[in-house]
Amino acid sequence: MVSTGWSNVTPWKTFREAPEPELAKRLEAMIPANANMSRMVFNFHCPPYGSNLDEAPEIDQDLNVKEAGRSMVPVGSTAVRDAIRRYQPLLSLHGHIHEGKGTARIGKTLAINAGSLYEQGVLQGALVELDPKKGIKSYTLTTG
């Protein structure tokens, strides 16, 4: 498993944000050269750009949500997307974008964002059953 809490730059300017080229270098440095990608899990906080796991409400220059949250835009990371496309791990797990609950396929890789409803006091998660021979046996998104 390769894990990181780093993300691409956001309007919120939080700790552990990096421009896409720097994030790409960080990811490359963490991924072992001879790793067995058929058993590899990427646990990257930021979801891949354009995957539908990264759809968030569009905001204006004053950080206010536009159109009452009806206008959604992709805000994930191109560096994360490119790493998944290049290495094709078995599974990639993501968070960061609370509205991005769901799954996506990027090549052979199953990507999951469990989403978040923490402001409502609701825990969301993903249960993934792995089989040493078959890879991903099953998965379920949970709310509770």
Please report, for each region that a protein language model flagged, where it lies by residue:
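Short amphipathic alpha-helical segments and helix-helix/interface helices
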Residues: 28-32, 77-84
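Active-site metal-binding loops of divalent metal-dependent hydrolases
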Residues: 4-8, 46, 95-97, 115-117, ...
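Generic alpha-helix detector with strongest preference for long hydrophobic helices that associate
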Residues: 61-65, 73-74, 92, 109-111, ...
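Binuclear metal-dependent phosphoesterase catalytic core
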Residues: 18, 81-87, 99-144
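Short intrinsically disordered, low-complexity coil segments enriched in acidic
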Residues: 1-4, 81, 91
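Conserved catalytic scaffold of divalent metal-dependent phosphoesterases
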Residues: 1-72
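Active-site neighborhood of phospho(di)ester-bond hydrolases with catalytic His/Asp-centered motifs
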Residues: 41-45, 74-75, 84-99, 112-115
